[in-house]
Amino acid sequence: MSDAAASRVPASGAAAGAKFWFVQLADGISRSNFATLLYSAFTAIGLLAFISVSTPYIFNVYLKIPPAEQGQIAGDLAAWNEAALLLVFGPAGILADRIGRSQVFTAGFIFMGIAYALYPFADSVIALTGYRVVYAVGVGLATAMLQTIAADYPRNASRGKATALIGTLNGLGVIVLTVGLGGLMKTIVARGQDPATAGYMVHFLVAGLCFISAAVVAAGLKKGTVVSKEQRPPLAELVRSGFAAARNPRIALAYACAFIARGDLVVIGTFVNLWGTNAGMAAGMEPAAATAQGRLLFGAATAAGLLWLPVMGYMLDKVNRVTGTLICMTLGALGFLFTGLVDDPLAKESLIFFILLGIGQISAFAGAATLIGQEAPAASRGAVVGLFNFSGAVGILFCTAIGGRLFDNVGPHAVFEMVGSLTVLVVLFAVWVRWKAPGSTTTGGGFMGRRAS
């Protein structure tokens, strides 16, 4: 894929081949466009991940659900979430290719804000599920656009470094917004408010941040579509293009990676938080304090991935993309499988396994995102990335629906061992693709990256 394929319509005031720090930008992309992308990477993932802190709090404070029943309900909520995403990702990608990325991204933040404002008012699991579906529509629109724009804006030579920078902002967003806002509920309770009032206050704050972010992306992202109106494929061709692209073995591998990697953050967020929260409740902690324990485990995994990501981004620009993906998915498999060694998640000696989990998760994400970013054609990139996200949603739907029952009936570690075992299958597929269809080396050069033809 040529650099020009990343963006064919120059933006007003954008210098050809502009550079943002160490990232070379595609033609027509301004520094302010890329800065807005980084802002959205910080807020979108951080705000969507807050649901993993919010849901156990809703269970314990508002709905009074017994801990023994929470795993299955959490898994069912995540499954409904992913079922809604399955219906959103495809149309989101097609809309992005037809009307533009910024409009779709803006709508995603608005839906997320509405859902968070409603979430603490749920008076039953059914109502909570309905609000979760509204949230899922917003997440589907926002994450589809984040992934698509992340493929649009950098030149191919900087794609790995851009993925690392965007992933770093993702991780910072999770730590600052999810961990910080989750801790705010405990702080408010400590200052004399009851837990229910604290929950309302923080959820309204999160909703407000979603609406502010909608305004920022509407103003700051590049307007219009990636190709001119004359170059746009017909709508029917766009719909078919995501499936047709899978004839490229590297895109097929990216879709398989998405089945695991695209949803790792959701799987980790749902079950690491729940594991830590339930362990805290079993130790006699109050709901806010127990939620904080789950949040700390999630934060440790996220922080580890954040520190590891620059290393992974540098490596991905030095090796063949398929080789890089193979390395990343291997780390992902190891990270998930090693959680089987955890007995007490709150014990100090268990922390290393959550650190490895975070490294594995972020590696799988970076490898999959870099590969699809290189291989997706410019004219139908939204549709191809939409199917990439669709594959991720199918994976999350499978893992969370089965995982919730494994969590309750086998043990918390079983969820992660299942994901790790599935990741091993993707690793084997990556070995086959590296052998049969490795594609060209990256433009960054380096070890293990010679052109294979």
Give the residues covered by each predicted segment.
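Intracellular juxtamembrane helix-capping segments at the cytosolic ends
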Residues: 141-155, 363-376
